[in-house]
Regions:
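Generic hydrophobic alpha-helical membrane-span motif
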Residues: 38, 148-151, 272-275, 384, ...
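Hydrophobic (often cysteine-bearing) scaffold residues that line and stabilize catalytic clefts
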Residues: 17, 82, 99-102, 121, ...
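Adenosyl-5′-phosphate
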Residues: 1-4, 8, 22-23, 71, ...
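Conserved adenosine/adenylate-binding substructure
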Residues: 43, 55-58, 73, 122-129, ...
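Short secondary-structure boundary/capping segments
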Residues: 306-309, 345-347, 389-398, 612-613
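Cysteine-centered catalytic environments shared across enzyme families
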Residues: 1-343, 348, 361, 517-518, ...
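A mobile, often basic/glycine-rich helix-loop segment
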Residues: 385-409
């Protein structure tokens, strides 16, 4: 994986602006510590930071190639998993390659098929190509949004970058937030409306979208979405197809010129990836697979079971490691480190995030990076197979089901800001927009249509939030993380599997569990879903409480501008006792809300944000 950034201005020669591009590129250093390069020509500049994974010597970027006497230059962040298939097809069409990188194959794919090349790609990507022949920039983002791509139009300039910080490094861009951005932070955070960059004037290319910038202006279009069709396969055929698509996705994503490991929590998703990878390693005669798990200091003493998190991971991790002969690394984070990484997690994300759910992952990825460059992880399984508790609720609630306690959260704001931001209406409008966009089948029942809406909401919102988290925290550690469940072929197929198949045996993700019979140990295969682990230690609550109190001692804290002092004091004094049910997702309760508010302060202070009312 890498960091990319660029600047196009048809009204201004950019050959003397290389120092600006160097600053923009340097902000992405953690995404690519292995190499730095700047490329420029006339009215375009590209910057690239590389994390070398495939074709260490031959994959340097930005990369320029010539085809039919025209030059094309690419800067690319991602990984293609059908590189060799594309290479063979392109060679048949007369293309010659200098190395074996996927970057070169992607560039030649554009040279051959132009914008239509994106339909042929299997992978995770965000890339930009300068097409000298047509004097335009083409950019695209992968179908599920695993890799990020932000952009901004500033006068006659068009800017893009893997992260917001690259765009903010440009002298024409100011860190400003208007009412819409504030509504994103206080109403939807830590999620974001698809395409919204929160900072005024900064947007994000939505998953499955592409863009073209030329002298005629900016054009953006959607090139992919799930398609609703009748599922005609029998249950047994469905199980077989799910198994094949999943195993093929994992196997394709094990290709690397550097060592690969897996995350292992003992849940069915990470265990399925680990089992498939371990079998492949054994078949290829490779050394045993290394697996990694995270736990918290004194967790065995303070762990508290709940409907969201019924049990700790340890016993299931041990069963998996023993069953597949992995070399397991049990990483234990202290409460001190957990709290200490909260502020940095904001900078890595460029936004207030998921509190210790972020900071623990940032620390964990750095532990993995000590020995590995690439890891596979189980994100997206619950969104596509229906694993979350809200998929199984009988309540037909209008609104995002992973966002609870909205009244209480909004109530923390001062009355004037509650009136200005009108958060209930803002959040509901975003919900309705997504529901209206859901691909439906006319002949489906009302219940079936509602299920599609729920899956679509999860795919566009909750899944994207978790993919953002995984990308920023892993790249903040210079670790590449791949997500087999985001293989678009698997997502497209599972989208149309009927609910009674998905719930086979009256178990969440039943069809996927059936596909894994004989592969996973039964104890792991039928373990009730448990989310990413979290701390229950009172020392963490005390630490974030003291942190927020210290920030509030600063008279110029942005929190004083927005929050009701009495209610904020009460939140701190009670250690968030009124938020016993997770207010976001499955993990974020009172202590996480306290930490999240401290992250909001850190964001305003670090980025020196101007507020436009």
């Amino acid at each position: 994986m890498c960091g990319i950034t660029g600047w196009v201005d048809f009204k201004k020669p950019l050959v003397r602006e290389q120092s600006v591009m160097e600053k923009m590129t340097e902000t992405l250093s953690k995404r690519g510590p292995d190499d730095t390069n700047i490329w420029g020509k006339h009215h375009v500049l590209f910057g690239h930071k590389r994390l070398a994974v495939v074709d260490i010597e031959g994959g340097r970027q930005p990369m320029t190639r010539t085809h039919q006497e025209s030059c094309y230059t690419i800067c690319y962040n991602g990984e293609l998993y059908n590189t060799e298939d594309l290479r063979k097809e392109l060679q048949k069409r007369g293309h010659q390659f200098k190395g074996h990188s996927d970057t070169e194959v992607l560039l030649h794919s554009y040279m051959e098929w132009k914008e239509e090349c994106i339909h042929r790609l299997n992978g995770i990507f965000a890339f930009a190509v300068w097409d000298e022949e047509r004097d335009l920039l083409f950019a695209a983002r992968d179908r599920l949004g695993v890799k990020p791509l932000f952009y901004s139009e500033q006068g006659t300039s068009f800017l893009f970058g893997s992260e917001i910080k690259a765009i903010l490094a440009h002298p024409e861009v100011k860190a400003r937030v208007d009412r819409q951005g504030l509504a994103e932070i206080f109403g939807l955070g830590p999620s974001r409306t698809p395409g919204n960059g929160v900072f005024k004037g900064i947007k994000e290319v939505r998953p499955g979208h592409a863009m073209r910038f030329s002298k005629d202006g900016l054009t953006i279009w959607r090139y992919w979405n799930v398609k609703s069709e009748e599922h005609t396969d029998s249950f047994d055929e469905t199980v077989e197809n799910v198994r094949f698509l999943f195993e093929d996705a994992v196997t394709r994503q094990l290709v690397s010129d550097v060592p690969v490991c897996t995350f292992l929590s003992g849940g069915v998703d990470s265990s399925a990836i680990t089992a498939t990878a371990a079998k492949h390693f054994e078949k290829e005669g490779k050394a045993p697979l290394h697996t990694f798990s995270i736990d918290y200091e004194d967790n065995e003493q303070y762990f508290t079971s709940s409907s969201f998190q019924p049990n700790a991971d340890g016993p299931w991790i041990k069963k998996m490691s023993e069953a597949f002969g992995t070399v397991h690394h049990h990483c234990v984070i202290s409460q001190k480190d957990l709290a200490a990484h909260l502020a940095e997690a904001v900078i890595v994300r460029d936004l207030p995030g998921m509190a210790d759910v972020d900071s623990s992952l940032l620390w964990f990825c750095r532990e993995i990076k000590k020995d590995f460059v690439v890891s596979l992880s189980g994100e997206c399984a619950d969104e596509i197979f229906g694993g979350y508790p809200w998929f199984h609720s009988t309540e037909d609630v209008k609104g995002f089901p992973w966002m609870r306690s909205m009244e209480e959260r909004i109530g923390l704001l001062q009355d004037t800001w509650q009136e200005k931001l009108n958060l209930k209406e803002y959040v509901m409008s975003k919900y309705e927009e997504t529901v209206h966009e859901t691909p439906l089948l006319d002949r489906e029942t009302g219940e079936e249509k509602r299920r599609r809406e729920l899956f679509y909401l999860n795919m566009l919102w909750f899944m994207t939030t978790l993919l953002d988290r995984k990308d920023r925290m892993s790249m903040g550690a210079s670790l590449e993380v791949r997500v087999p469940f985001a293989d678009h072929r698997l997502v497209e197929y599972v989208w149309n599997i009927p609910w009674d198949f998905k719930m086979h045996g009256n178990r969440e993700k039943g069809v996927f569990r059936k596909a894994l019979e004989g592969i996973l140990p039964n104890e792991v295969l039928y373990r009730k879903k448990s989310p990413y682990p979290k701390t229950h230690h009172p020392a963490y609550t005390k630490a974030v409480k003291q942190w927020l109190e210290s920030l509030l001692n600063q008279k110029d804290s942005a929190l004083h501008v927005f929050l009701d002092k009495k209610k904020l004091d009460q939140l701190i004094e009670t250690e968030g006792a009124s938020f016993q049910v997770p207010w976001y997702g499955q993990l974020m309760k009172g202590p996480q809300l306290i930490a999240h508010l401290a992250q909001i302060h850190t964001w305003f202070e670090t980025y020196r944000i101007d507020i436009e009312e």
